[in-house]
Amino acid sequence: MLARTFLGMAISAFLASTGVQAAWSSNGPNVMYYWGQNSAGGSNTQASLGTYCESGQVDAVLLSFLHVFNVGGTPEINLSSACAGTYFPNTQLLSCPAVGADIKKCQDKGVKVILSLGGAAGVYGFTSDAQGQQFAQTIWNLFGGGSSDTRPFGDAVIDGVDLDIEGGASTGYAAFVNALRQKFSSNFLIGAAPQCPFPDAILGSVLNSASFDYVNVQFYNNYCSATGSSFNFDTWDNWAKTTSPNKNVKIMFTIPGSPTAAGSGYVPMSTLQTIVPSLASEYSSYGGVSVWDASQAWNNGDFSSQLYSLVHSGGSTPPPSSSTIKTTTKATTTSTKTTTTAAPTATSAPGSCPVANQSCSTQNQYACTADGKYAVCDHGKWVVSSCPSGTVCIPTTDGTSIYCGYATGSGSTCPSASALEIAAASFGSKNGPVPRPYKASKVAAQLAVTSTDKNSFEAVINARRTTLTPFEKSVTIEFTTPSNIKFTESDMGPVRQVGNKVRIQAKNDYNESMTLVVKVKGSINSGVFVAPSTSAWKFK
């Protein structure tokens, strides 16, 4: 309670000294935050909804999440500690009057409040268009202008709905969106949160057949994160202009709010200061920045204040103010990634590709060649080698190294550049091959190789259910790896490898979830990291 009181005093002082007033703009750019899940995990790391709206650093807040649809019955919401324990009689639906009061407070300040549906945990989806239409009526009655005895936020009315559909099937969502359009006013916002691989495994067809106001593309936990050479904002911009039913749809650059907010893809402010102005100047569909989530960003130094200034000033970021708002520092500890001194850095200048026997300056520097091979700087000369059959050279998601992987598409993946060099280059020029999806029964997955060095690697397995049946508490992942690669650990449970057969016993953070994000590590016995085969993956 003391921490919250101090926080409120700090905000009041900040607003008094600056007079900052955030407000949503239909033309953008805007800054949006997911709020409710307290993913930072501390007892005081998430402030009240109204606190963030009063900060002057937020244009829209996404209430996260309505995670159980229960079509035909009463849905369920989960806002972590912001609303817990008080249910409507004979239901599992929370009553959250304090959140309802804060919704009105936010709206009075011009901040949009949007209800996000789905998320990683929970059970959701439709079996028919009729169910989608029926659920739109439920949203109208419980959160819109309709009436019900079980309105979680009282008479507060939300400003929009966000589809953060991490798993399941696409059935019914277009009908749901179209039904919402008929019930709510024309300024009601409807958005979606696809992952960056295009098209999205779940929402791809929905985005092509229904009208959305914005799309929060998740540029993290995948190969297409912003710091890698496969950053594909240009692909989403092209979709917005050529395929989207709403040609004025805004593409939001959605990122983690701190290094611990996602398995991979965090972008430091020094790099954002290059990327954000480039996006704003190059793509007319750019709508601003969305962040997962508020608890992470507000416990990451001056991230939130610097980001708001960056987005709304066209790129210049002033020094941190002494009145910058912060929540109490998270009490729990997290592991910090370490790198070895033998990392195969990839710092070739944009536009240049290694050629065999040409000179190079950095011993053990690795890079991709123009024809999909990989080069190693060995005693001042490039030594070029072919990737194993069926694979090509692909840069890692952190932009500092390379690996050999199975890919779709064609073209050059060189040069592998540093994150800052990638950001400075033209985003529209990256048309090379991208990692091929991993498919298993009822699961779509991606393996994002985060980093490699001469002896080790780190990667993220991002798995999504493609049916309405969620992952359970314990999930066994099995696949085959090349003979030079040894998987040794994961952040979700023990790893066992016999020969080239790998088994991960993942302990899900949730009893039921539509997605799994598993961080893995291992060793490289010789050569470079080679990705596992895309076939014969099993999730049990």
UniProtKB/Swiss-Prot annotation:
Residue ranges listed under propeptide: 418-540
Location of the protein in the cell: Secreted
Sequence ranges of Low complexity compositional bias: 322-348
Processing after translation: O-glycosylated.
Single GO biological process annotation from the record: polysaccharide catabolic process
Residue numbers spanned by region Disordered: 314-348
Molecular function terms, GO-annotated: chitin binding; endochitinase activity
Region annotation Chitin-binding, high affinity: where it falls in the sequence: 353-404
InterPro entries xref list: CBM19, Cts1-like, Glyco_hydro18_cat, Glyco_hydro_18_chit_AS, Glycoside_hydrolase_SF, Glycosyl_Hydrlase18_Chitinase
Coiled coil: none
Role summary: Probably involved in the apical growth and branching of fungal hyphae.
Protein name: Chitinase 1
Species whose genome carries this gene: Rhizopus oligosporus
Gene expressing this chain: CHI1
